[in-house]
């Protein structure tokens, strides 16, 4: 491809021209089963009629004005998200990083209003919250931060799924104002949190007057079989961030606030040029409509359970397999060794996946995936994994 592009991606040697459903076609008209969905973005697959119509109609009418004016599509999407989540207010942006940046700013401003001029946020090891400096500082990855110091201060990282560690961190640092975590770590290797842990963190935050901030950028919008993954624990955060699947491929992010976090920001506290524009919000409304009308929450739960069970059965007892894990259509297969080459081999076999944390095969197929298509994933992927492990003995 063009040498004018910045060299920041290790791209696979394929270009796609069009897609339909869970399928993509390359420049040579070869078909691929897309089990990655643009890293969890294309939740309705490709070429979804309702989404295409909403984008086309809105683009023909109006693409952009400004947040200095009323934006009806933005207000409508905010209402829908508030209804689905039980949250009170929504701030739109353009990406997950921006949504998490807004959450970090809100937590600090929340502390500032209480007289805490150096608010601290507790985050988790192996977490991922974005590539801006503040979200990198919050992210539990030394590798991602390497070379970009000095990092913003005010972040305390503790082991994931470890409630006593969070409690101890708060006792050691009296300036803590918030806890930021993922219900299901994506870049961290598809690591689910314990439901008891989530409920315990919710209770601890309430007791200590901290904000519970949940990053649902990858796990939200139906991916686990509920609108938001934290709903499996029957809790409500004070702050939630969304992006990826929210508009089915059109760039968007959102930060939702409730309880003590609602009303913290005022005019001038934060802002965005493009966030919550008419086009992105029209797409977001179409995504929510499609998920509701097509029963995609149930589909993600049921087909995801089928895919999980099939992979676990086929890989049971295979030397080198650590675990098949995840929830809904957010699944990971952990191997005992680095396996990045599997993304290339799967692509060569007509299946799109990726590998995170060096040794976890990640699957994030569209929510429209059928049982038959899930079986196709298994038929392609399992032999590739077995062959790879046998060659590495």
From Swiss-Prot:
Any one Gene Ontology cellular component term annotated for this protein: cytoplasm
Signal peptide: none
GO biological process: L-arginine biosynthetic process
Entry-linked InterPro entries: AcOrn/SuccOrn_fam, Aminotrans_3, Aminotrans_3_PPA_site, Class-III_PLP-dep_AT, PyrdxlP-dep_Trfase, PyrdxlP-dep_Trfase_major, PyrdxlP-dep_Trfase_small
Cofactor(s) named in the record: pyridoxal 5'-phosphate
Pfam families per the UniProt record, alphabetical: Aminotran_3
Documented EC number(s): 2.6.1.11
Pathway assignment: Amino-acid biosynthesis; L-arginine biosynthesis; N(2)-acetyl-L-ornithine from L-glutamate: step 4/4
Xref: CDD domains: OAT_like
Catalytic activity: N(2)-acetyl-L-ornithine + 2-oxoglutarate = N-acetyl-L-glutamate 5-semialdehyde + L-glutamate
Location of the protein in the cell: Cytoplasm
Modified residue annotations for N6-(pyridoxal phosphate)lysine: 244
Sorted UniProt keywords: Amino-acid biosynthesis, Aminotransferase, Arginine biosynthesis, Cytoplasm, Pyridoxal phosphate, Transferase
Ranges in a coiled coil: none
One MF annotation (Gene Ontology) recorded for this entry: N2-acetyl-L-ornithine:2-oxoglutarate 5-aminotransferase activity
Residues given in the record as N(2)-acetyl-L-ornithine binding sites: 131, 272
Residues that coordinate or bind pyridoxal 5'-phosphate: 215-218, 273
Enzyme class: transferase
Record note on cofactor: Binds 1 pyridoxal phosphate per subunit.
UniProt cross-references to HAMAP family, sorted A to Z: ArgD_aminotrans_3
Miscellaneous: May also have succinyldiaminopimelate aminotransferase activity, thus carrying out the corresponding step in lysine biosynthesis.
Complexes and interactors: Homodimer.
Similarity comment: family membership: Belongs to the class-III pyridoxal-phosphate-dependent aminotransferase family. ArgD subfamily.
NCBIfam families: argD, PRK01278.1
Protein name: Acetylornithine aminotransferase 1
Organism of this sequence: Bordetella parapertussis (strain 12822 / ATCC BAA-587 / NCTC 13253)
